[in-house]
Amino acid sequence: MKMVVVIRNDLGMGKGKMVAQGGHAIIEAFLDAKRKNPRAVDEWLREGQKKVVVKVNSEKELIDIYNKARSEGLPCSIIRDAGHTQLEPGTLTAVAIGPEKDEKIDKITGHLKLL
């Protein structure tokens, strides 16, 4: 069981901004998973809440990953920045998928490089 966070690397976000966007994505995906499959969430919590952070280099890649996760019925989230600091309002910044079985997520994100 794991969660994968996908961050856009093409936006020039500072490290703190990337962490914040990833945090937003994690919370939203967790809430989605809690609704869809509470037993999977409980298992993930017991196993130590494994998270992996990877990167993409475009909005298109981010949207494609999100759409694949949704089409597979996986818990997921996509984050649009509010535009208060570094980015324009509505900029897509991050996706989180899971918690779910590793192999289900790897099917979608296994080719991506670690951030």
Curated annotation (Swiss-Prot):
Keyword Hydrolase among UniProt keywords: yes
Domain of life: Archaea
Keywords (A to Z) from UniProt: Cytoplasm, Hydrolase
Cellular localization per UniProt: Cytoplasm
Enzyme Commission number(s) of this protein: 3.1.1.29
Chief localisation class: cytoplasm
Reaction catalysis annotation: an N-acyl-L-alpha-aminoacyl-tRNA + H2O = an N-acyl-L-amino acid + a tRNA + H(+)
Annotated family: Belongs to the PTH2 family.
Biological role: The natural substrate for this enzyme may be peptidyl-tRNAs which drop off the ribosome during protein synthesis.
Name recorded for this polypeptide: Peptidyl-tRNA hydrolase
Species: Methanocaldococcus jannaschii (strain ATCC 43067 / DSM 2661 / JAL-1 / JCM 10045 / NBRC 100440) (Methanococcus jannaschii)
Chain's gene name: pth
